[in-house]
Design a protein with these regions (language model features):
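Active-site rim beta-loop-alpha module in soluble metabolic enzymes
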Residues: 128-161
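Metabolite-binding pocket within alpha/beta catalytic cores that recognizes anionic/polar moieties
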Residues: 1-137
């Protein structure tokens, strides 16, 4: 094993960009990396696949996280140690509002923290809200297919809980 590489993601300092896109599914990494200029496969270890390239002249990366908060936490902590500091989680989800249609882009402005992982980082009372500067940037497209609102992550629960 190479001691300079992070244990789970197998990435070393400097191999990733400051900005990292985080899909859950490892197979999505290659698809996303196609939009980079000169993408390079950096690592492929378990559920963690990482590509780095440039986009509009900026070094960017994509790393899969697998499913769930604990796996995403591992990826982000190790990526941070390698120089990343801005993460965009992308993926699919279910919805409960009838006006949100399949294929709509939903940008979460906040989250209800009903799971266990984030409690290890901040008290449950601490609001999980988006960075307002980046949130404003994400809405620049003005598309009617973009939706803004809150998301909810929760541990498994029974219907009548």
């Amino acid at each position: 094993e190479d001691a300079s590489r992070q244990y789970h993601i197998q990435v070393a300092k400097g191999e990733v960009g400051r900005y990292v896109i985080l899909p859950g599914d490892p197979k999505r990494c290659a698809k996303i990396a196609q939009y980079f200029d000169d993408p390079v496969l950096i690592a492929d270890n378990r559920e963690y696949v990482t590509y780095t390239g440039t986009f509009d002249g900026v070094k960017v990366s994509v790393t899969s996280t697998g499913i769930g908060g604990p796996f995403a936490s591992i990826a982000m902590e190790e990526l941070y140690r390698c120089g990343a500091d801005t993460f965009v989680r992308i993926g699919i989800c279910g919805g409960m509002q009838p006006e949100v249609k399949s294929g709509d882009v939903v940008i979460a402005t906040g989250a209800v923290r009903m799971e266990g992982t984030t409690r290890e980082y901040a008290p449950i009372e601490y609001p999980a809200v988006a960075n307002q500067e980046r949130e404003a940037w994400s809405g620049e497209s003005g598309s009617s297919r973009h939706r803004y609102g809150y998301s909810c992550s929760c541990r498994g629960h029974k219907k009548n809980d």
